[in-house]
Amino acid sequence: RNAVAAKMQDAHELRCGSVAAAERAYALGYASVALETICDATQSSDAKPLDWGEPRDVETLKTAPRLRLLKRLTVRLDAPRMSVPQKVLNAFDIVAVVPETDDAFRAACSCNDVDLISVACGARLPFAVARKDVEVAIKRGAAFEVSYAHAIAQPRSLRHLTATGLRLAALTNGGRGLVLSCGSPDTWRVRSPSDVGALASMLGVRNTDGVVG
């Protein structure tokens, strides 16, 4: 299960919390969208992929050419290890972790079941982004994700996003293994691939043709 970029390569990807956001993503030019299930680590054994709805609700998406519909699990982790049943992991295309402590960040970077380490950028990080942990994650094929939704309307959040993004871009060799994501079910927060590419350039990502969303 590693190398999340391989699952999305040559295609812009967007994580969505609603079908409406997914529809807007496709209209903006994204080639794959992921509907996201979010849970705490204690609830992960009961996690199930969200339903895309009745066929009539997603007819445009399911018949769209070159569009991939993905299922994503995002686990909020505050413990030094992640324990999610394999049958749960197998039900999803992408497994992401939002670490909330230093130990959780270290665990997410080293766990082979984790595709994405999702860093919440709406406030100051509750853990240190250590170079050695980042290198462990990149070596095994995982990627780091920063979300821009909060930064759109809140200047303070934009400062946190910029600081975190610059740090991760520097530690990932110019943004290799860095994913920029909306991270919101609100359609108005979804930005086009070109807008996200501009943000990536601002953060020091040298190649903005990679995975953004």
Predicted features along the sequence, with ranges:
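Extended, charge-biased low-complexity segments
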Residues: A27, K62-L77
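Charged catalytic cores and adjacent phosphate/nucleic-acid-binding surfaces used
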Residues: R1-L35, A41-E59, T63, V84-Q86, ...
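Hydrophobic/aromatic-rich structural module bridging two neighboring secondary-structure elements via a short loop
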Residues: P80-R81
